Amino acid sequence: GALTLDPELAMPDYVDTMDVHLMPGCWQDEHAEGDVAQGAIYAHGGQVFRGSLLPSKTRSGVAASVSKWLSIRYPEFKPEKILETGCTIGNNLFPYKDIYPDAELTGVDVAAPCLRYANARAVARGVDAHFSQQNAETLDFTDNSFDLVVSSFFFHELSVEATKRVLAECRRVLKPGGMMVHMELPPSSQVDAYYNFFLDWDNEHNNEPHYRDFRSRECADLMASAGFSADEYFTASIPDVGGADPAYFRQVALGEAEPPKHGIYTSWGLFGAVKAA
């Protein structure tokens, strides 16, 4: 895979004006030539969000769960080109190779240190993946380039206006008949008052200024603003594939059983679209 960096890329304000997650240097600060430090810090600093949930074979994460869900829900869908926006260090890009081994993977992010780290991880793991330093609001790919566009925990880091621009770009680069699947935190209208308080704590105390504004919006409205029709749009909630009984996971994927309530390594909330052919 190729690593393509753009040293002239302007950092968006929602990245450059604060240390998101209170992580010193955020994602993009560079301290030396070829620096990967912020990627490594993110890889380990992100563990704080697990709390006591240490990595294990029964916790697979977003991409493993989404790709498995896609393979069950849409068995004829075989994406040849997959794009992840806001890929950081590749955690939620690599697992798509397990389900779609022939797919070409591409990840974009504004942060060069994270992309260098992601590329090094891909090489070490033997995963063929391309990484490109781009702002997802203005992708340089041609129209109708990808079969599948994904993201994980991405949009709540952006302003709502930036989110709308990214979704419009996702639509532009998506092939007719292609699919877009974004995993995000649930809208405030879909959870109870305590869970809203629990999630909104980050908005006040963890340098997450766009968190509450994003969650106050309905995903259907955001999608409509990007040009997706109601017929194209969908939402879903799926269990984490690592911790779920395979038969139960399959039932949820097929709409034959209710998913568990939202929670890290319990259930993942999705929204997306199938672009009209």
Model segments located where?
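Conserved Class I S-adenosyl-L-methionine-dependent methyltransferase catalytic core
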Residues: 1-77
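Class I SAM-dependent methyltransferase SAM/SAH-binding core
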Residues: 83, 89-138
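A short acidic, Gly/Pro-enriched loop at the edge of an enzyme's catalytic core
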Residues: 137-149
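Core SAM-dependent methyltransferase catalytic element
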Residues: 226-277
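Nucleotide donor/acceptor-binding cores
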Residues: 79-81
